[in-house]
Amino acid sequence: MFRLSALLGGLGLAASVLACPSGQQQVCAVVCFCAPISQADIEVLYEDVSQMAASGLEQWLLQSRETAAASGTLPIPLHIRAQLEPYYDIGVLDAARYKVGDGETLGAANTMLQNPDVQAVTLIDIIVFRNAADAQDNVALWAHELLHVQQYQQWGVREFTRRYTRDHDAIEAPAYKLQIEVARALRAQVAQSGPAR
């Protein structure tokens, strides 16, 4: 089943839910209807729309990154970096920068990145946090966002956006998995150290 509806806010091509006559496929663009189009044509259309969505996301990321960089960024806080060194190559940790509170960038991220509860957004190598507390204390969130920095490094911006528009869950799942792993490790570390005195 294609995920086109996730790409362009409701424009989609889905597997047949309603029976279409022979030689027709269900096409959904605001409403669903049967059209005399082959599965091969649907795949070509899907690829074209997917490429347009990826290109738009790529341009937004590049422009947003430049805007964020121009207004100033900071390196990863040392206490955060020290806790994440076991999880990341030095190249990821050295490349990543951050800033706090750019509401306009985060607002666009809510729309562009299909995630209504964004706490941070990674603009290639710049992580924009919604609030300063997360930037200074949320090691698990840092782990999540740094995985995206690593993905950008491995794939490049164009390939990242292509993959993201095709299946954003496949991009986010490993980041959420690592976020949970780091949170558990931190809780275990606190439990082993005992109560504060």
Regions found by a protein language model. Give the residues of each.
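N-terminal signal peptide c-region/cleavage motif recognized by signal peptidases
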Residues: 14-16
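Post-HExxH zinc-binding segment in Zn-dependent metallohydrolases
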Residues: 91, 154, 164-197
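A metal-dependent hydrolase signature that marks the N-terminal structural subdomain at the beginning
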Residues: 20-101
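Auxiliary, metal-adjacent structural segments of Zn-dependent hydrolase domains
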Residues: 71-121, 126, 181, 185-187
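Second-shell loop/turn segments in exported
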Residues: 65-73, 128, 132, 161-166
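Short pre-active-site segment immediately N-terminal to the catalytic Zn-binding motif
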Residues: 112-114, 122-143, 165-167
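Catalytic Zn2+-binding segment of zinc metalloproteases
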Residues: 132, 146-163
